[in-house]
């Protein structure tokens, strides 16, 4: 009987430790505030777009600056940020279709169904 009780107790302890996500990692966003409204374009090295995810419910846009100046968050609602994202998407589309002679418009959409970050250089 003691063996059965010990087995049940051990099973409950193991089952209690198995979880899908650590509670301490919830709501961990890279950007702690709303971010900058603009940065100098000549200082931009890379633009990363992070859609909302289980670990962060905000849409984040992080830019890496040249010359080791680090990373900064951009305000996703600012006009400057939307223009930077449009240029980055347009540049990426041109790189993926180098022999295309057609032109089109790119519409800004800050919603995404995937949770993987998108990076543009």
From Swiss-Prot:
Q: Provide the residue span(s) of the region labelled Disordered.
A: 95-121
The secretion signal range is: 1-20
Subcellular location(s) of the protein = Secreted
Where composition is biased (Low complexity), the residues are: 100-115
The answer on whether this UniProt entry bears the keyword Secreted reads yes
**Alphabetical list of Gene3D superfamilies matching this protein:** 2.40.50.40
Gene Ontology biological process terms from the UniProt entry? defense response; immune response
Q: Which UniProt keywords apply?
A: Chemotaxis, Cytokine, Disulfide bond, Secreted, Signal
Q: Which domain of life is it from?
A: Eukaryota
A single Gene Ontology CC annotation of this entry is: extracellular space
Instruction: Give the induction annotation.
Output: Up-regulated in response to bacterial infection by S.typhimurium or M.marinum.
| CDD domains to which the protein is assigned, alphabetical | Chemokine_CXC
Q: Which cysteines are joined by disulfide bonds?
A: 29-56, 31-73
Q: From the UniProt record, which GO molecular function terms apply?
A: chemoattractant activity; chemokine activity
- Kindly report the protein's main subcellular placement as a broad class: secreted
Question: In UniProt terms, what function does this protein have?
Answer: Ligand for cxcr3.2. Chemotactic for macrophages.
Name of the protein in its database record: C-X-C motif chemokine 11-6
Originating organism: Danio rerio (Zebrafish)
Q: Which gene encodes it?
A: cxcl11.6
């Amino acid at each position: 009987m003691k063996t059965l009780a010990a087995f049940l107790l051990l099973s409950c302890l193991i089952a209690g430790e198995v979880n899908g996500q650590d509670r301490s990692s919830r709501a961990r966003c890279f950007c702690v505030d709303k971010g900058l409204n603009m940065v100098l374009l000549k200082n931009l090295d890379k633009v990363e777009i992070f859609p909302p995810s289980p670990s962060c419910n905000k849409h984040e846009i992080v830019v890496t600056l040249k010359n080791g100046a680090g990373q900064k968050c951009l305000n996703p609602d600012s006009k400057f940020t939307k223009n930077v994202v449009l240029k980055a998407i347009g540049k990426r589309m041109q790189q993926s279709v180098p022999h295309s002679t057609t032109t089109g418009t790119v519409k800004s959409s800050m919603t995404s169904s995937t949770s993987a970050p998108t990076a543009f250089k």
